[in-house]
Amino acid sequence: MATLYIVRHGQASFLAENYDLLSPMGEAQSRLLGQYWSSRRLRFDRVCAGPRVRHKDTVKLVHAAYEAAGLDLPEVQTVPEFDEYPAEAVMKFGLPILLDLDTRVRDLHAAFLHSAEPKERQATFQRLFEIVIAKWAHGGLHLEGVETWPEFCSRVNAGLDQFLSAGGTAAIFTSGGPTAVALQRALDLSAQRTLEASWMVRNSSWSEFLYSAK
């Protein structure tokens, strides 16, 4: 049996102008992950990352921790199939549609705009985000030119098929969505459970799978 580690990136810059950058906390989380793995002498045959800055910067900080410990990490491949689902596009184009149709969305959006306390603002946005993304995932939002949920899952699974075919101990640095698709693949989760899992995966955590290479 071979082993796969799927890592969610360190904390990104939530509600900042550029979400894709690691926050100072995200950088610290990534360093700690690298220090922990290197302290356990965990070695990989292959490592890849999704295409986002937050994916690549997380693995760079893990790599730096390995170098500091005198250990090697394989050259990192960038695999576009392990990008996150198109959350930004869904929110940009889907939210205005739901603001016209759903009272609950309008109320949450108003509460978000008027909330001054950071934790309250973050919690309100998360509830709003989950409603809009769930509507899209279940086919309730048809957004021209935006990847659908089934297309997203197919993309990630195609990446997994290709990356896992070589076997060995492998690591993928990605986001919560692709991690959840791997969980769906292993546990036969429903679409709703898969979506919920994508929101539960913690920053810089890893999910570990045993698999048979094809």
Where are these regions (language model features)?
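Loop-to-helix element that buttresses phosphate recognition and phosphoryl-transfer chemistry
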Residues: 3, 10-64, 147-153
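Active-site metal-binding loops of divalent metal-dependent hydrolases
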Residues: 10, 176-177
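Short aromatic-enriched loop/helix-cap "lid" or pocket-rim segments at secondary-structure transitions
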Residues: 18-19, 87-93, 184-185
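Phosphate-coordination/substrate-recognition cap region in phosphate-metabolizing enzymes
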Residues: 35-126
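Alpha-helix capping/helix-boundary segments
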Residues: 54, 178-179
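Alpha-helix-centered segments that form part of catalytic cores
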Residues: 113-158
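Domain-level recognition of soluble alpha/beta enzyme cores
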Residues: 190-213
